[in-house]
């Protein structure tokens, strides 16, 4: 009885192209505790992610604090490479697709979608526009993301935890989203496999054979600033009683996934 031929080059388990996740950014807004930043870096690195951005952390030197270094364990390189920004708009300036992670639904916020669907959407966007970046945005430990921060994103996702006790710490939430991204990069899920989880349909332009480059976060913010000034100038927007016009306009245009030439 002959033995089966051995593979000349065994396929490593759970191997994925590192470039598939290299342009995924995790953004932490207003983080208070250095240990959480370190634990976040560790959670990211275990799933092959390395791009960490901090917006107005409580401590400017948070990444070099002993508690952060200790919780990062073997992921101190992710801490060392972390970038700090004064505002979320600055952190998303070169990002063309952003997902807000929040347990609370927000009025006039972006369309909601399950974590695995957001992961699939993000990597699909990178497949069409490999020169771009996508981001997952997390809020402060005690307060989460503000309404204004959520409204800057294209999708909103939440983790379906137990309603009896749904409190996740920051690093746990990051670990789950990072896992969803890695699983998608390994080919473990598909957007089409979860139609019941989807609350939106992609515009036709996103499945075009030659899609136009998506607008960056900076370009989109400039578009909204110009639009607001124009509406004020013609008297359509009352500065004393703006109501919900601009949040509605923001949601409308972000849902359309604007291209660079459209803004």
Predicted regions and their residues:
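Post-transcriptional modification and biogenesis factors for structured RNAs
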Residues: 1-263
């Amino acid at each position: 009885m002959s033995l089966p031929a051995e593979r000349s080059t065994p396929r490593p388990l759970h191997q994925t192209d590192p470039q598939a996740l290299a342009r995924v950014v995790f953004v932490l807004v207003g983080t208070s505790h250095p240990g959480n930043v370190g634990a976040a870096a560790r959670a990211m690195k275990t799933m092959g992610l390395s791009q960490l951005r901090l917006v107005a952390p409580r401590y400017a030197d948070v990444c070099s604090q002993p508690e952060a270094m200790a919780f990062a364990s073997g992921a101190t390189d992710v801490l060392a490479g972390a970038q700090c920004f004064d505002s979320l708009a600055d952190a998303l300036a070169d990002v063309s697709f952003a997902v807000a992670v929040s347990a609370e639904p927000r009025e006039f916020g972006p369309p909601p979608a399950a974590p695995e669907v957001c992961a699939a959407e993000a990597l699909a966007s990178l497949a069409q526009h490999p020169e771009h970046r996508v981001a997952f945005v997390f809020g402060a430990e005690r307060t989460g993301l503000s309404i204004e921060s959520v409204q800057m994103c294209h999708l909103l996702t939440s983790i379906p935890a137990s309603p009896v006790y749904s409190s996740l710490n920051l690093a746990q939430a990051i670990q789950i989203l990072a896992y969803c991204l890695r699983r998608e990069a390994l080919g473990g899920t598909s957007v089409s496999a979860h139609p019941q989880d989807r609350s939106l349909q992609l515009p036709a332009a996103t499945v075009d054979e030659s899609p136009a480059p998506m607008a960056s976060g900076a370009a989109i913010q400039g578009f909204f600033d110009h639009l607001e000034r124009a509406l004020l100038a013609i008297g359509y927007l009352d500065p004393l009683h703006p109501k919900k016009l601009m949040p509605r306009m923001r949601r409308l245009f972000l849902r359309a996934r604007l291209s660079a030439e459209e803004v």
